[in-house]
């Protein structure tokens, strides 16, 4: 394949429609430079020193009136800006445009003779050396902007990017395929369509979400990966929904036909997994439908050894987009070093394939594209391909969006958009070429709208003519791209018609041979679907001990700043108190300091940490202060970049005001780099439900469905403190409902030292078969509560404890109160004011897995126990009560009374009035501590 391209440089100046005015101003400048604005003085000084410019401009001006030039410029601008509306991008059923701006020569009272008398340089600054006159140049522009690729880039604000695109698009350029390459491209299409036809014939009615109508997607991906290989990009991350997924798996990731057909036959596909280990396919114990599954292929098929990953995906359209971005960033980051990670955008690139109805319809796309240029999230440019079959299930565009194109939503992110006819395979390749060049040059996203159609219904059991009869009359008559391109090659004499049909038949034979290798009797019929033995136990404590001096060295380093760094005095007083646990007998380590010490020791162990959230650098509640700001210069300093003997990076970023995309990004990052301790912190836990799709469809079910492991940690501020229904509850009950098969750890802590040991335990589990998500109902007011803060000796040894008890005399206890988090602290402080040895408070630090054995062992030590109470802040239908009740009921059996104390059932999580909150909270505490 050769690319014939004439390079041209941009002229020093192009005044366009303002030519007449600028010449007048130039004359004024020659007489008196100070008579024109300063910026024009600089420009005119440059022009004055170039003898070739002004005479050419004056020649054009003298031959043509300013009015003529203005009309020419208006025509040119319209072609660039609106030519896409008349482009040949629709293989079938072109839309009827009601309002199209003027785009023809005649519309501007111009003709060939007039235009032939005007310099081509007026049309475009780089045309002067290519075309003889404006007429030739405009014909070129019409062909270019109204051809099989429709270009939209005039909305881009950056002049350099816009100018680059203009030159790249308008410079004569042609992708020239030799005959062998054309044959190879035809064969690619024949395999793509032949695969679909075979499945359609042999598995009638089976859902496969056919690619037919946008078949060119596969050669476009192959072209993209080949270009990436030449650029040295060795990690390709692909995200897509179900449409065309099976074809991409087989023809891009090279999943054997035998494996794919086995899945349709419900036999074991893993028997056909390549023995060379080049294809990685993980599976969970409950599994998922075939068109949700992904895989990883290591191959040199595209020019160099590359790792090509197709992300697993639920049916929730577009939600995989931020996951793919996170996976890509993880592949780009070097985290095995001290300080912050270094990011190399040439290591990996993301390709995200969207649907035309879902792309403008799903808000996750807005959130994800907003990450594109942010320091903590950029991946150096994503390639977005819209598989535009111009319908969503049964909904047509008129009911699906309020814009001309499904891609219009991308304009707000200053990215170029190319619409390309899916039946013009060579045009689709050129669109990829331009997109990849732009990404390489500017490290920004590009959107390609692959405009085609959908051969069948939404799925293969659906009849589209019920709701879309007219379009499908034309689609049924329309040849597939395999035949469109094949006939083109026949007409060009590249192949004969017999060769075309012979190869199409050969594809069917190859598929039949693969099919015949499968034993129909080898059914997968195990209904038990047991979780792996590695998940039999809860998160195990990391009981590494530390000397006092070791932790003091870390603490001192975290409180040492560069010379001349000016910390706000008010903040400095707070930070200086962190010396007290090491300098004073009664010094205590609060929550934030416990976290800093844990992070530092984890970094020393070689585990990188990445923490993001809307205010995570400081902390919503002004407690963390992980990034310090010089009060005079604004410069920043991150102490955790300077830990003694640090072996891994600490990366912290304030996130955009987004939950779903940011959590999806962190999930993807951790899936790709399982050694990374990824933490997402909600501003308030109440806002976490904006990420519910990520929780439901990825984080808590991915291992069961796909065998995909994640150790993402969530910090969700949760406590009832009179701040109303939207600043009180992280919806603990929802996470407990998602908890099963040891798929996560859910905690609500009351001790800073237990928090320290928990973080270390989670870090130790990463990149092991025991890794799993961690959900922390993190504190708010407890961040500074002295009851939560602990002495340093609780940090030097020990490990995470699932329950904590107060000191007690066993034979005096008649009532046990089980509580968690702030509720436990409130009860403890109330009991301290009115001591009662008959009441034993037990902090349930780990809610899932529920600590049955620990509680059972404790209750067995209390010979006079009469009552067990569960006490919570949340309403009865929320919080942990409905989850813990079956466990506690079994433990209590008929030996003790069981009672509940908390808010009554409520539709909203909390009261809106702070004073009423206090009354209700005090009543709960009073009733709970009352000894019947």
Swiss-Prot record:
Q: Which GO terms describe its cellular component?
A: cytosol; oxoglutarate dehydrogenase complex
SUPFAM superfamilies from the xrefs?
A: Thiamin diphosphate-binding fold (THDP-binding)
HAMAP family this protein is in? SucA_OdhA
Assembly, per entry: Homodimer. Part of the 2-oxoglutarate dehydrogenase (OGDH) complex composed of E1 (2-oxoglutarate dehydrogenase), E2 (dihydrolipoamide succinyltransferase) and E3 (dihydrolipoamide dehydrogenase); the complex contains multiple copies of the three enzymatic components (E1, E2 and E3).
What does this chain do? E1 component of the 2-oxoglutarate dehydrogenase (OGDH) complex which catalyzes the decarboxylation of 2-oxoglutarate, the first step in the conversion of 2-oxoglutarate to succinyl-CoA and CO(2).
Similarity annotation: Belongs to the alpha-ketoglutarate dehydrogenase family.
Protein name from the UniProt record: 2-oxoglutarate dehydrogenase E1 component
**Species this protein is from:** Staphylococcus aureus (strain NCTC 8325 / PS 47)
Q: Which gene encodes it?
A: odhA
